[in-house]
């Protein structure tokens, strides 16, 4: 006799329901076991040396205010978030602290307010890869930056660069991985599918998930790399122009501006180190030998001169002092050209602003604004490539030289245009000798911005952390 012949209907339904619950529970358990773990301390036991060296990036506590060092940049980014504040990057340990604390992300009161999109988390946390897996790319990118503040809580770490769920990783191998689908697509565009790359290329590509140029596109403001026409400054400039893309409209000149992110990968590729397959980890994450003979990759990403014998000395025969002098001289050359370009571009912005006031038309201004756009894009591309004076100084100097040329083109046209409007005297530039004076010249209410940010950090962020702790307690 079959079960259905002797089992009553209520019992049958109850049995079926119970079996479904058991099945759902087992599936959920399997999903939880397979979930990407964004917590860096979850890998301390199996990878102690790597974990503790990564945690040592917390030693870079000092914050360097780049706008105070160079107030020109306040004017160059007028109307954009970087004019509010721009601090030099610290260690990976502080990635989340820094993006939460910067004035650029504003002081959102709820998940639907604030100036920035969700994409601004994309390079800051392994939680990004987790959320994309769980919700899809649209489910991650959609909305404002504050929407998933309680989900993005672990700083840059293990699951950003490694397949931490793989058997190889659990056995002690690095098992490098691209953890953002938009990065995989970008490498496919330039014919460098990650799975087909050499070990050295993979080591560089993993870093290129973040140390790279990108922009926000579409209704969700999703991250995309502008590599469709190539990876040089000129290639990407053509790409952006073809799309008629702009990051913002300059508050003084009204030029349609581009903001370079941090194209370290692109400039490295063009420099002597990249061309000779000397990759990021060779200089910034060297293999080191412990007293007991154990060899591991040091995850305290930092200045190669701090570990000279394990980095530079592996290839170079010069002394540490000799190499430091070479690098310092290159840095000085790049800095000098940087300031030269800034002087010209700042003047062009104010002269363009004066032209508008004098009655210039959009048709008259269009070629001038395009020159300003190109000049500042090239300046920004060079200076935003952290360490470019070491990675590719010749690229930096060439690109900055073209920035000066484009700015000169704009100013030459402006002189002629201003003359037709009856303005023949030099345009006066306000006092921008300090960060505060430059921000005041733009009418920025810094006292209010800082007060709003403090309120956000005191009231909103603690709620994010509390919700995250409750969620992660279930892992």
UniProtKB/Swiss-Prot annotation:
InterPro entries: Cyt_c552, Cyt_c_NO2Rdtase_formate-dep, Multihaem_cyt_sf. Heme c 5 binds at residues 273, 312, 315-316. One of its GO terms (biological process) is nitrate assimilation. Substrate binds at residues 214, 262. GO terms for cellular component: outer membrane-bounded periplasmic space. Pathway: Nitrogen metabolism; nitrate reduction (assimilation). Residues 38-57 are annotated as: Disordered. Residues 1-29 form the signal peptide. CDD domains: NrfA-like (cd00548). It holds the Pfam family Cytochrom_C552. Heme c 2 binds at residues 158, 161-162, 299. It is found in: Periplasm. Keywords: Calcium, Electron transport, Heme, Iron, Metal-binding, Oxidoreductase, Periplasm, Signal, Transport. It comes from the Bacteria. Heme c 4 binds at residues 280, 283-284, 391. It is an enzyme of class 1 (oxidoreductase). Binds 1 Ca(2+) ion per monomer. Binds 5 heme c groups covalently per monomer. Ca(2+) binds at residues 213-214, 259, 261. Its main location: periplasm. Catalyzes the reduction of nitrite to ammonia, consuming six electrons in the process. Belongs to the cytochrome c-552 family. This is Cytochrome c-552. It comes from Vibrio parahaemolyticus serotype O3:K6 (strain RIMD 2210633).
